[in-house]
UniProtKB/Swiss-Prot annotation:
Its cofactor is hydrogencarbonate. It is found in: Plastid, Chloroplast. One of its GO terms (biological process) is menaquinone biosynthetic process. Keywords: Chloroplast, Lyase, Menaquinone biosynthesis, Plastid. This is 1,4-dihydroxy-2-naphthoyl-CoA synthase. GO terms for cellular component: chloroplast; cytosol. The record marks D148, Y243 as: Important for catalysis. Substrate binds at V30, L31, V70, G71, G72, D73, Q74, Y114, A115, V116, G117, G118, S140, S146. It comes from Cyanidium caldarium. PROSITE patterns: ENOYL_COA_HYDRATASE (PS00166). SUPFAM superfamilies: ClpP/crotonase.
Length: 268
C-alpha cells in the first residue's frame, strides 16, 4: 500500500500505512527538541489516529538517527514556560503525556540516538519501546533548571524503582541502550539498520491480536497508577513557578551560555 501523507505539518511528519500510523518529530536541526507547535501537531496526529478506525497501532519516532527527542527547545523557554508563535507560555507537553498514557490503541516508541529530558519521558509514556544500539537515554532537567514531578518521576519510579529513578534525576547521567534495557526503559535493542523493520513487525504482531482485549488490558495496567494524573497536573503548575525562580533561571541561562550552572548560592 502507498504511504499517505495526511497533514501538511511543519514540525512533524505523519504517515499511515497498513493499519499503522507513524508520528515523526521532525526538527533535526535541534535534535528533534519540541516547541509548543511541535506538541500541538503531535496531539493533532494522535487525535486523527484515534478517530481513524483503520489504524490499530501508532509509532512515535524522531527524524534521522541522531535523536528521538531531546525534550523542550531551551532557546524558546521563558520564565513561565515555552513560548508559542503568539508569544504565550505553554507546557502543553503535559497534555501529550496524558494522551499517550490513555490512548485507546497501543503506542510504540521507536528510539534512535538521544532520548533525553522530556524526550525520554515521551518514550517512557509509550506502551512499548524499540531502541537502536546507538540510543542514549537520560534526564537533564536539574542541569537546565527544570524538572518533571509528575509522570516523569512518579511513573519512572514505578518502572525502574525508586533508587534508580533518583539516580537518573539527581545525577542527570546518560545511559546507552543496553543499560536502559536492563533498567526497563526499553523493551528491545536492535541494530540501527533493523530498527524500522522491527517496529513494523512488532506493530503487525499486535494488529493480529484482539484490539478490544488490548484496549481493556491497557486500561487495567494503567489503573495501578491512576493517581499520578492528579500529581502530574499539580507538578505542571509547580514547574511553571520554578521557571520563574532565580534558581530555575540560572540553569536555563547556563544552558544558553554554554557553561556549567552555578547552583551553589541556592544551597540551604
Amino acid at each position: 500500500m502507498q504511504t499517505i501523507a495526511i497533514k501538511d505539518f511543519i514540525d512533524i511528519k505523519y504517515i499511515k500505512q497498513d493499519q499503522i500510523s507513524e508520528i515523526i518529530i521532525s526538527r533535526p536541526q535541534v535534535l528533534n527538541a519540541f516547541r509548543p507547535r511541535t506538541i500541538n501537531e503531535i496531539i493533532a496526529a494522535f487525535y486523527d489516529s484515534r478517530e481513524d478506525s483503520s489504524i490499530g497501532v501508532v509509532i512515535l519516532s524522531g527524524h534521522g538517527s541522531r535523536a528521538f527527542c531531546v525534550g523542550g527547545d531551551q532557546k524558546i523557554r521563558s520564565k513561565t514556560g515555552y513560548i508559542d508563535e503568539k508569544g504565550r507560555s505553554s507546557l502543553n507537553v503535559l497534555e501529550l503525556q496524558r494522551i499517550i498514557r490513555t490512548f485507546p490503541k497501543p503506542v510504540i516508541a521507536k528510539v534512535s540516538g538521544y532520548a533525553v529530558g522530556g524526550g525520554q519521558i515521551l518514550n517512557m509514556m509509550c506502551d512499548l519501546t524499540i531502541a537502536s544500539e546507538n540510543a542514549v537515554l537520560g534526564q537533564s532537567g536539574p542541569k537546565v533548571g527544570s524538572f518533571d514531578a509528575g509522570y516523569g518521576s512518579a511513573y519512572m519510579a514505578r518502572i525502574i524503582g525508586q533508587k534508580k529513578a533518583r539516580e537518573l534525576w539527581f545525577t542527570c547521567y546518560q545511559y546507552d541502550a543496553f543499560e536502559a534495557y536492563k533498567m526497563g526503559l526499553v523493551n528491545w535493542v536492535v541494530k540501527i539498520e533493523d530498527l524500522d523493520s522491527y517496529a513494523i513487525k512488532l506493530a503487525t504482531d499486535i494488529l493480529n491480536k484482539s484490539p478490544l482485549a488490548i484496549r481493556f488490558l491497557k486500561s487495567s495496567l494503567n489503573a495501578d497508577c491512576d493517581g499520578q494524573s492528579g500529581l502530574q497536573e499539580l507538578a505542571g503548575y509547580s514547574t511553571m513557578l520554578f521557571y520563574m525562580s532565580a534558581e530555575g533561571q540560572e540553569g536555563h541561562r547556563a544552558f544558553l551560555e554554554n557553561r556549567e550552572p552555578d547552583f551553589s548560592k541556592f544551597n540551604s
